[in-house]
């Protein structure tokens, strides 16, 4: 991954821990740039990256399992500080001549350690709570190492070779359950690796703009804009770098939220004076979706049609050499490490044609989602746009269960607008990770005035989450839910019932389709 030479880097090597991205994020929160790479990275690549420190992540394997993950032991001879976490500590012990064995019982959960070190534990109390998760245990440390923390269950909760600046901890400092975990990581990054913490969004913008200008020169760039946070930030960053050399194509497939298409044109076309081509393709999409009720088929049709529409418009433009995409660092990690696992396929509108002869520009592919939001604020994008709700590529097409019709889309569009308005008025928009309405393929009997009705049911989905991988339903106050329900049944035609989804993820997903 491209990186400014003067930028401090902490390299995290991935051994399959569910917390590996968290390590990277914790370090970035300290103002120090960090990247996650596969454990099989070569010594030559590491030297080229010139990291200030290396962290070996945890992992689910035993160091003695056949085919278990390992590293080139030469890493320990580079003169770069190394911190091994759980599996990383066990692997370090084994590779440097110590002994590791299977524990009688897997140690999982909170534990109390007694620490002593003027480096890793500097300024921290001796007794502290940590989070353990391991099935192997160290029984003999390598030559040159000493114990710097123990616990009731192990004599080797943390070890160090101070001369070579190699450290190991048998717990996870990156998780919130570890009482002083952030402080320990900060000690490693600042005290041991001597990082100054100068990585900011302001610096990121300066570096990226210079990289974009050098690469693009006087050529032109095309950007597929959806109005979502990622594509919006990419477009504004590129526009700041190259101005009118950027052209954005906004495909309006007719499956957007209320007023969304006009908002994109107003905020970005007029507000940022960007060159945006709006393609009204609603009829084209609706014709393709007619009679289709299977969710996977709907998603595929929407994705494919988006590609065809974009391709048609792109072919009308001459002299375009680059295509910009809002790829995030999580996408890079999932596609770039052997140990990564995709929990769920995402709702991104399908990939663009392979035969499109463009060079790719992905200016935010080193950032996590929360960092992209910070970047957006730094670029001057209004907060209400930066903090917009995540919206799937197929749009309302997967929030109308079953066949999509204009009438059903209007019900979802209007009910969703009411939900968002009330949530905003109640000041809950930052407390709830995601909230939206869905239209199940359900009708029920009701009474409105003196008349019997047989109309649609609207479902409300609102969840709290940290990263979207797991979530819980939001505990919205009953009076607020009543207000939302009352407004929907009174203001949206053909709705006589509102229900609230109280399912967590897992077992359900956040979206209904």
UniProtKB/Swiss-Prot annotation:
CDD domains: GATase1_GMP_Synthase, GMP_synthase_C. One of its GO terms (molecular function) is GMP synthase activity. Signal peptide: none annotated. Pathway: Purine metabolism; GMP biosynthesis; GMP from XMP (L-Gln route): step 1/1. The active site is at residues 86, 172, 174. Residues 199-388 form the GMPS ATP-PPase domain. Its EC number is 6.3.5.2. InterPro entries: Class_I_gatase-like, GATASE, GMP_synth_C, GMP_synth_GATase, GMP_synthase, GMPS_ATP_PPase_dom, Rossmann-like_a/b/a_fold. It catalyses: XMP + L-glutamine + ATP + H2O = GMP + L-glutamate + AMP + diphosphate + 2 H(+). Keywords: ATP-binding, Glutamine amidotransferase, GMP biosynthesis, Ligase, Nucleotide-binding, Purine biosynthesis. Pfam families: GATase, GMP_synt_C, tRNA_Me_trans. The keyword Nucleotide-binding applies. Transmembrane segments: none annotated. Residues 9-198 form the Glutamine amidotransferase type-1 domain. It is an enzyme of class 6 (ligase). ATP binds at residues 226-232. GO terms for cellular component: cytosol. Catalyzes the synthesis of GMP from XMP. Homodimer. NCBIfam families: guaA_Cterm, guaA_Nterm, PRK00074.1. This is GMP synthase [glutamine-hydrolyzing]. It comes from Staphylococcus aureus (strain JH9).
